[in-house]
Amino acid sequence: MAETYLLDKLASVEQTYQELTRMLADPDIATNPDELQRVAKARSSLEETVDTYETWKRSQEDLKGARQIVKESGNDPEMREMAQLEVEELENAIGELEKRLTILLLPKDPNDEKNIMLEIRAGTGGDEASIWAGDLVRMYTRYAESQGWKVSLLSESLADMGGFKEAILEVKGDRVYSQLKFEAGVHRVQRVPVTEAGGRVHTSTATVAIMPEVDDVEVKIDPKDIEMSTARSGGAGGQNVNKVETAVDLFHKPTGIRIFCTEERSQLQNRERAMQILRAKLYDMMLQEQNDAISSNRRSQVGTGSRSEKIRTYNYKDNRVTDHRLGRNFDLNTALEGEIHTIIESCISQDQQERLAELAEATNN
């Protein structure tokens, strides 16, 4: 990693980190909770890079010392052998540190820290597609819970035979978008449906959208573009059931997006939820346009996030999940129980390798 531009970037990151550390000790910042949180978060985001860089610098000094010992131990073969062994170990360690540093210096996705709206829609396959959408809701809920994230159902359209025509979950926690963004796309299942008397294998699909949460500052919505009506909702029981119009049906005229919210107790809360979902959908549309422009210039396997991209097949007969972007198979039963961390980490790793290759190509040109 002798590239000057990388070393310059690391020195700049370290300088920024030190400045942020000084700011945390500033009494004016210490008495301003919002600013204190902002500075602490910015410093924390650089901590791993700086720690790894410090380890790299120490290892370089140790390597220099070990090489000097090799040079000076001419008449002491035992000392020379020990020093040579240390040189080899340090060179290997430095190589791994340099790989890690290069990944840490890759441009950050500004949405990685955000919470998400996770939308699952039944695709082709009729009733079986809705049942499959329900299975995916369960899979992602279990995975989120295993990560210590909070999951809430924001909107649902139940299917007659079970499952969902559509479901929208809110997932809150540490770096949720960074972990789940590569789950967007078409998920295909091959199995014998419970509704199939003849035992034939059917193929059905469901589409997953991963939408980072945004506030009203990031996405402006003109009130004139909104049509809103209310309806009676099942509510939470008691006198409220079917008597008060708490459900909200929101229609965004420019895009044709319609959102029906019933999960909250009051009409105001459901309206706020519907607007929250609409903002996420509009922001996601903007991201899709950006990604389409980027992916036309990029040989990306995992990073497109296209709604029409078939990313995975779940084959019940062979107890196998195939991720088509990775060209790898995984165990079906564990995946359906929410144990998809290995698949997710593999997607993240492949995306990093692709971006590193692009960086190397750009540097050489």
Swiss-Prot record:
Post-translational modification comment from the UniProt entry: Methylated by PrmC. Methylation increases the termination efficiency of RF1.
Subcellular location as annotated: Cytoplasm
Keywords: Cytoplasm, Methylation, Protein biosynthesis
Highest taxon listed in the record's lineage: Bacteria
Gene Ontology molecular function terms on file: translation release factor activity, codon specific
Pfam families, alphabetized: PCRF, RF-1
Positions bearing N5-methylglutamine: 239
GO cellular component: cytoplasm
InterPro entries for this protein: PCRF (IPR005139), Pep_chain_release_fac_I (IPR000352), Pep_chain_release_fac_I_sf (IPR045853), Prokaryotic/Mito_RF (IPR050057), RF-1 (IPR004373)
Statement: the UniProt record of this protein carries the keyword Protein biosynthesis: yes
UniProt main location, coarse: cytoplasm
Gene3D superfamilies noted in UniProt: 3.30.160.20, 3.30.70.1660, 6.10.140.1950
Annotated function: Peptide chain release factor 1 directs the termination of translation in response to the peptide chain termination codons UAG and UAA.
Family according to the record: Belongs to the prokaryotic/mitochondrial release factor family.
Protein name: Peptide chain release factor 1
Organism: Synechocystis sp. (strain ATCC 27184 / PCC 6803 / Kazusa)
Source species taxonomy: Bacteria, Bacillati, Cyanobacteriota, Cyanophyceae, Synechococcales
Gene expressing this chain: prfA
